[in-house]
Amino acid sequence: KKICIVSGDPNSINSEIIFKSWNKLNKKTKNKIILIGNYELLKKQRKKINIPINLNKIDKIERIKTHDNSLKIIDYPLKFNDCFKVKKTQAAKYVLGSLNLAHQLCIKNEIKGFINCPIEKNLIKKKGIYGVTEFLGKKNPSNKFSEVMLLHNKKLSVVPLTTHIKIKDISKYIKKNLIIKKINTLNIFYKRLFKKEPRIVVLGLNPHNCELEKNSEEVKIIIPAIKELKKKYNIVGPMVADNFFKDSYKNFDVVVGMYHDQVLIPFKNFFKFDAINITLGLNYLRISPDHGTAKDIIGKNKANPKSLLKCIKFFDNFK
């Protein structure tokens, strides 16, 4: 079983966390890894950050030789002058193209899924697409499932109902059918991945759940959705969000919030690099490190590879 890693944003710490992770892996795991990226770019970045690693360019997965100690790279084209300052137009083509290639390899069943390293959202942002989760959701259309962003640590997982949208627009997106479809997807895929029925809690949207006023989103949308979902799943809510993450979260496996920062701020504060991002609802497994491109430390050899290593371990154990 191959572990495919997509190198992601060229203007980032990605090559550094890939190289550092590689040097911490055992030979058996190394033999499973293929990287989609630009060979020349990675060579130049390796030289700049001065991390010893052997790189080997390949053109097809089946031609991988497993007996050597080199990182196998499926070379994807990229035009650049400075290896850490690639122009935005070229970086966008590279990121979209390499994600598309990984998707096609999954569709052809050459790989079971992939890990993508961090990507600046502006490189793939267009109408209706705000991040990799939505990008892959559009490529995996389903009437039954919806793409779901699950941030996972062994102690807790969180799901934002809405992902990379502006705060002022959140209430427009919150619909009963969306809540039901997302939580259906969450429950089914969580059981597949973790072999257990999740204990799910849903947070309200408004401060103090707007004291459950009759025109609030809680009363009109969230409570009716939860009432319907309770017939099938272990789910409660809506809970008031402001003090929920003090202790109450410990009674649940998954916390579903109404928007991105409602659940990601406390989650990242708890677990920092000790977490991964999983997209549920796809025809294959897609995971990524739970952090961004860290442009402030590019090329400084200060990046922490822990989250990528967790991704590799999770993927390697996936059956």
Question: Can you say where each PLM-predicted feature lies in the sequence?
Answer:
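Anion-binding alpha/beta catalytic cores of soluble intermediary-metabolism enzymes, centered on
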Residues: 1-319
